[in-house]
């Protein structure tokens, strides 16, 4: 398991991250998130200390965006940072639809000991306008088994560890 008891982790916004949040409720953790749904859900569990980054609420994702949250993210040193994306690609890296979201996601990962992309294989080969980071800047990529073999082989030559989730 990537997440261990006592870890300080950052969770990006989105439906994939909510699924991850559901898998870690049994662990004592410190969780920092931009996602309002994740913050409210995890706050129900006494062994999990939840911090929401603050800032303006993005109505499309019900998450915090803007400089306020970015400043907090720039001053923390989490064990793990889980980032999601609109698209990911060997050549283009991880991408986001807006400059503001791309910047926030960069800060979310910047100081983490492990930088983990959590992305559905259906988003592979798709990309948005703004680059977040190259895949080589990650320590781990977690995706599902529907990734084509050729893509999987290409990803296994990179420095991030490729993890196929059940």
Regions found by a protein language model. Name each.
Residues 1-15, 21-26, 30, 36, ...:
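HTH-adjacent hinge/linker in prokaryotic transcriptional regulators
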Residues 36-166:
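Conserved phosphate- and dinucleotide-binding cores of soluble alpha/beta proteins
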């Amino acid at each position: 398991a990537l997440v261990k008891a006592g870890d300080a982790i950052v969770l990006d916004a989105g439906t994939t991250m909510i699924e991850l949040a559901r898998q870690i409720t049994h662990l004592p953790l410190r969780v920092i998130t931009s996602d309002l749904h994740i913050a409210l859900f995890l706050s129900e569990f006494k062994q999990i200390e939840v911090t929401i980054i603050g800032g303006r609420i993005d109505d499309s994702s019900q998450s915090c965006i803007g400089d306020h949250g970015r400043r907090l993210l720039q001053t923390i040193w989490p064990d793990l940072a889980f980032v999601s994306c609109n698209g990911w690609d060997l050549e283009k890296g991880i991408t986001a639809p807006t400059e503001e979201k791309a910047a926030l996601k960069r800060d979310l990962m910047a100081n983490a000991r492990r930088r983990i992309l959590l992305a559905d294989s259906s988003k592979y080969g798709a990309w948005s306008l703004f680059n977040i980071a190259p895949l080589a800047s990650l320590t781990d990529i977690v995706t599902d088994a529907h990734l084509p073999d050729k893509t999987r082989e290409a990803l296994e030559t990179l420095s991030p560890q490729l993890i196929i989730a059940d």
